[in-house]
Amino acid sequence: MVTRSLADVVRSTDNLAEAFRETDVERGNVHFSVYPDEYTNWIEEQRAWSETCILMDQSYHLANFYIEGPDALTVNADLGIRDFEALRGQRAPQAKTHPIPNPDGYLVGDPVLFYLGEEEVVVTGNRGLGQKWIQYHVETGDYDAEVTDIYSPYGEDPPLEFRFEVQGPNAEAVMAEVFDGPLPDISFFQMTTATIDGHDVYVLGHGMASAPGFEVFGPYEHHDEIKALIHEAGAEHGLRELGGRAYKTTPVATGWLPPGLPAVYDHEDMQGYREWLSADRVEANWSLGGSFESDDITDYYVDLVALGHGRFIDFDHEFVGRDALAERIDDPERRKVTFLWDDEDVVDVFASLFGDGALHKFPKFPDLFQQWDLGHFDRIEIDGDVVGVSMYSCYDVNFRGVLSLGVIDTEYAAEGTEVTLVWGEENSPKRTVESHVEKEIEATVAPAPYVTAREDL
């Protein structure tokens, strides 16, 4: 039996961007299909991360790849902007963000690399986009390493590890009761080990939105026991567990912009990867949406420098995409920003549901778009000219408004710039998109992350 590949999918269509714009998302966002929409209600779950604390069970929606062997660090350094070879001989564990560019410097994926030992790393991230690119190089290149896909949200096997995140003003008080010993003294993105009820766990300092936080992970067999201990300790501190609806809104205030489309579909140096990658993978079944339309698939790619990863690039080592990124590191065409939507214009969208007149695209709160696409691109305009795209939008009760992350031409990236965001997807062939008329929404440019006190990675 011949298995279809991503390359077969690309060859089978004359216009890949159009094909992805016509693709429906089945069962909503698969990452969160294992979670209830709400454990209590999404408004109080949102409030908790700024007023008390939250528990996020990350055991099921992230792809986790173990890479073991003498070249475990080498292959990641060859493909990522960080020189992971520098970790050799250093203490473990450590964690580093791991933005991975294509040969032109556009984002393939942005997982996190956990350094557990000189020949052992775990790469964890969204949909496995960067991890599959790494796996391809390990399997086809001259690397003394082995990749094990220990868990995929698209597979049938249960995870081998649990992963919990506790965030918010009361997170330290909760976790002080959960850890067997003293509260780990680690800052943002530092790691250590600890025990919980006698079980060994890894601990990552992962405060977000100006509040303290911890990420703990270990063998999945202890999932239920440790989760119960966190809930027990959190009861008197206002802890709430996040359901899928509130969870999907967490990236916006903290400034993490997921890939709207992995940059893997066009470059000739990635043809071998496209032939290797199965057509069952999400890359071959992507869904694009929003008011921005282009027939050029590369117009949906996003530059690593525009996303703010430039400060992490180590140009002293060779890696895929190095030359392209070096050319624009000092003069990026676009920058990541937050767009603050005008309240009255948002109310007008809902008001169109009543009375006469055309309907506007219904924004199901709190995450506005993920019911009908995987990568969202709404036009950002000034005087009718497209100057950027809004890519990830939500309502956040902590700000009492709608805000979104996106990228905008550098000359318009200053805080306070007034822009027009075009909301909707007129004449969409998707079954999940109702007939509607696009709506112009006034918006204001703000920093990303919007909660500016967040510490650097």
What is each PLM-predicted segment?
Residues 110-112:
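Peripheral, non-cofactor segments flanking catalytic/redox cores
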Residues 1-33, 37, 115-120, 124-457:
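Conserved, structured C-terminal
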Residues 70-107, 169-201:
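Internal amphipathic helical hairpin motif
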Residues 1-98, 106-108, 336:
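Acidic, proline/glycine-enriched N-terminal capping motif
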Residues 57, 103-105, 370-372:
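A short catalytic or substrate-binding loop motif that flags glycine-/basic-rich loops and adjacent residues
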